[in-house]
Amino acid sequence: MKDSYFLDTMNKINQKNDEDFQSEEFHCPVEATLSLIGGKYKTLILWNLIGKTLRFSELRRLIPSATPKMLTQQLRELEEADLLIRKVYAVVPPKVEYSLTPLGTSLRPILESMYEWGSQYLLNQGT
């Protein structure tokens, strides 16, 4: 069951239209995953969007160390990877909302495991 899920996911990843992404050859599923979520703020963006729709300004408040330029870049890369949806409203001032796609939502157990591991690590470090 898990093997077929990962094979299906890998097939979807390898069928992406992005030329740079298509030229990559992955030797391991972990490598493919990290190529999608390995950016400096990507995991934090994904974590904050679990079960929510947020505007750019809300993401900025939740991830204060990200500059607007870097946050925009990371959001674009996640959108190109089909992990999030960017919805633009034709209003003044401009309104843009971000939410996870089904593929992005499928990362939830991984992100929750990272959260648990990080919590234990910090506890053991006395932080």
Where is each model-derived feature located?
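Basic, amphipathic "hinge/linker" alpha-helix immediately C-terminal to the N-terminal HTH DNA-binding motif
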Residues: 90-114
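Hydrophobic alpha-helical core bundles mediating ligand binding, dimerization, or RNAP-core interactions
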Residues: 30, 108-118, 122
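Short, basic amphipathic alpha-helical segments that act as recognition/interaction helices
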Residues: 55, 119-122, 126-127
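N-terminal helix-turn-helix DNA-binding core of bacterial DNA-binding proteins
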Residues: 21-70, 90, 97
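Residues within the DNA-recognition helix of helix-turn-helix
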Residues: 74
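Short, intrinsically disordered or compositionally biased N-terminal tails of bacterial proteins
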Residues: 1-18
